[in-house]
Amino acid sequence: VAARKAFLDGGSEAQINAAYLAAAGHTDSDVPYNNIVALNENGATLHYQYKSFARPDESRSLLIDAGAEVDGYSADITRTWARDDELFGELIEAVDREQQALAHKVRAGLDYRQLHLEAHLRLGSVLKALGIVDMEPDAMLQHGVTSTFFPHGLGHPIGLQVHDVAGYSDVDGQ
């Protein structure tokens, strides 16, 4: 909430990061990983690490991937916000809906690989519905199109290790 407010108030990446840290009760040195705070085009750079002190002329979007820690338990909080861009706002809302629907399917014993593939198919459906990609979702998956928009794994063990590796392993960890 604090990061979103700083973004909407026109803050710089550094100011948005400072607002997040203050709200989380942390400093840069005690978060579980370096926060990613990216305005506008910077959000397209995977693991963007620069937090500019300069306020952009126009803040159109914010991507924040920030950590927090309580009693040795690490959390990874990732959010994206858009301002004054109807299509991007619709994309964010649609991806949020699909993420929540997929999260509700998680059960003990469910194969992670199936969820990972379903996430790509759901993303493909969103991209097609919004007219961003003119292909069927299964064709997008087959040709690696969804990987352009989703270049990482579905998730990772929060609290144990806060970085995931793209792809997936079999039940024996291979």
Which residues does each predicted region cover?
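Active-site neighborhoods and metal-handling regions in enzymes and metal-associated proteins
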Residues: V1-Q174
